[in-house]
Regions:
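SIR2/sirtuin-family catalytic core signature
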Residues: 150, 155-157, 161-197
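A short, well-structured juxtamembrane/interface segment
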Residues: 33-48, 155-163
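Short beta->alpha connector loops
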Residues: 38, 64, 180-182
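N-terminal accessory alpha/beta regions
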Residues: 1-31
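Short, surface-exposed alpha-helical recognition segments that flank or form part
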Residues: 9, 32, 58, 151-154
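Surface-exposed cleft-lining segments at the edges of enzyme active sites
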Residues: 28-35, 145-151
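Extended, H/D-rich, highly charged conserved domains that either
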Residues: 1-10, 44, 48-142
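Short, basic/glycine-rich phosphate-binding loops at helix/coil junctions
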Residues: 17-23, 135-144
Length: 197
């Protein structure tokens, strides 16, 4: 996960620090009650939802649970494709640690049974604060050489492939928010899709 000469203890301390920061952010988000800002966020997410004939998705490098929290508040089902987990509106809301399989058959596809009209396919390209491997290690990709780590985790590798596929669909619209263009594996996909268009 981290490049450089870090001891196993240092690596664990870094992971725990990252998890604590995300936990603190989650607590702050839950108590944030500015109606207009929350409403704006909900309305924006609805623009990315799918219905049976839609094709919207969000691909993110963020590892927090901000989107999941706001989807729940907006009665939007938030689905992690290929992961047997989704957050359903009108149900008690809790972001638990989610077990991520270390192997995914190329034929295995989790199809969420959505109960409502609005659902959001949410691809977390660098893992998530609430994702756990079978070993109970967190699945957070940080630091340099991210592609090597992504290729070690089938779910992230599949998400990378899905990102490339979405970018290359005809008439794709891409909205980039808060990305500093420091991840070469992402930049390469963007450049290839742009030159192929």
């Amino acid at each position: 996960m981290f490049e450089g000469k870090f001891s196993a203890e240092d690596r664990q301390d870094i992971k725990e620090a990252i998890q604590k920061v995300f936990g603190d952010i989650e607590k702050d988000t839950e108590s944030y009650n500015y109606y207009s800002a929350r409403n704006l966020c909900k309305e924006l997410m609805k623009k990315f939802t799918k219905t049976h004939d839609g094709s919207g998705a969000i691909f993110t490098l963020n590892q927090d649970v901000f989107i999941e929290t706001h989807c729940h508040d907006a009665n939007i089902q938030c689905i992690y494709p290929y992961v047997a987990q989704m957050f359903v509106p009108n149900q008690p809301y809790k972001i638990d640690n989610i077990s991520i399989k270390t192997k995914i058959s190329k034929y295995e596809r989790y199809v969420a049974k959505h109960n409502g009209d609005l659902y959001l396919s949410y691809f977390k390209l660098h893992g998530s604060i609430n994702w756990r491997l079978e070993s109970n290690d967190s699945l957070l990709i940080t630091g340099g050489n991210k592609l090597a780590y992504i290729n070690k985790h089938p779910i992230l590798e599949e998400y990378q492939n899905q990102f490339a596929a979405f970018l290359n669909k005809p008439n794709t619209k891409l909205l980039i928010v808060g990305y500093g263009f420091q991840d070469m594996h992402i930049n390469n996909l963007l450049q290839k899709a742009s030159s192929d268009a």
